[in-house]
Amino acid sequence: MPRRRVIGQRKILPDPKFGSELLAKFVNIVMLDGKKSTAEKIVYGALNVAAEKSGKSHLEIFETALDNIRPQVEVKSRRVGGSTYQVPVEVRPVRRNALGMRWLVDAARKRGEKSMGLRLAQEIVDAADNKGTAVKKREDVHRMAEANKAFAHYRW
């Protein structure tokens, strides 16, 4: 542990189109090789397609999809006397958002549609309807935590 003062998290500017910090963070996660304008085109295009398909507003469908992906608990490995236990721990809000967005992008990249924009749009629509690969990932993590609830007293 460092002995100096704790450094706060950097403030990130809200995205120019919707004024949402969460969406700006999402654009940064989609971005590859520092190509932010390309990432913005992909995300905004995906949100347009998703909004058309669902009939909801852009931000509303994104928020709904993210809510359905964010994990509440996860498991962390903890070594106790020679054996390793998977200990369920609650996920902090900042990490919850980060994991949800990362899982959403990973699931979209593994899909079969033509362009990344379409893949992302379809994954957002699926996540908003509580189905899709990203939601399945969250369910798997929750199932692991539930299965290892007996080791919850090893929390640190």
UniProtKB/Swiss-Prot annotation:
<comment type="similarity">
    <text>Belongs to the universal ribosomal protein uS7 family.</text>
</comment>
<comment type="subunit">
    <text>Part of the 30S ribosomal subunit. Contacts proteins S9 and S11.</text>
</comment>
<keyword id="KW-0820">tRNA-binding</keyword>
<dbReference type="InterPro" id="IPR020606">
    <property type="entry name" value="Ribosomal_uS7_CS"/>
</dbReference>
<dbReference type="Pfam" id="PF00177">
    <property type="entry name" value="Ribosomal_S7"/>
</dbReference>
<dbReference type="InterPro" id="IPR005717">
    <property type="entry name" value="Ribosomal_uS7_bac/org-type"/>
</dbReference>
<dbReference type="GO" id="GO:0003735">
    <property type="term" value="F:structural constituent of ribosome"/>
</dbReference>
<keyword id="KW-0694">RNA-binding</keyword>
<keyword id="KW-0699">rRNA-binding</keyword>
<dbReference type="GO" id="GO:0000049">
    <property type="term" value="F:tRNA binding"/>
</dbReference>
<comment type="function">
    <text>One of the primary rRNA binding proteins, it binds directly to 16S rRNA where it nucleates assembly of the head domain of the 30S subunit. Is located at the subunit interface close to the decoding center, probably blocks exit of the E-site tRNA.</text>
</comment>
<dbReference type="GO" id="GO:0015935">
    <property type="term" value="C:small ribosomal subunit"/>
</dbReference>
<protein>
    <recommendedName>
        <fullName>Small ribosomal subunit protein uS7</fullName>
    </recommendedName>
</protein>
<keyword id="KW-0687">Ribonucleoprotein</keyword>
<dbReference type="InterPro" id="IPR036823">
    <property type="entry name" value="Ribosomal_uS7_dom_sf"/>
</dbReference>
<dbReference type="GO" id="GO:0019843">
    <property type="term" value="F:rRNA binding"/>
</dbReference>
<keyword id="KW-0689">Ribosomal protein</keyword>
<dbReference type="GO" id="GO:0006412">
    <property type="term" value="P:translation"/>
</dbReference>
<dbReference type="InterPro" id="IPR023798">
    <property type="entry name" value="Ribosomal_uS7_dom"/>
</dbReference>
<dbReference type="InterPro" id="IPR000235">
    <property type="entry name" value="Ribosomal_uS7"/>
</dbReference>
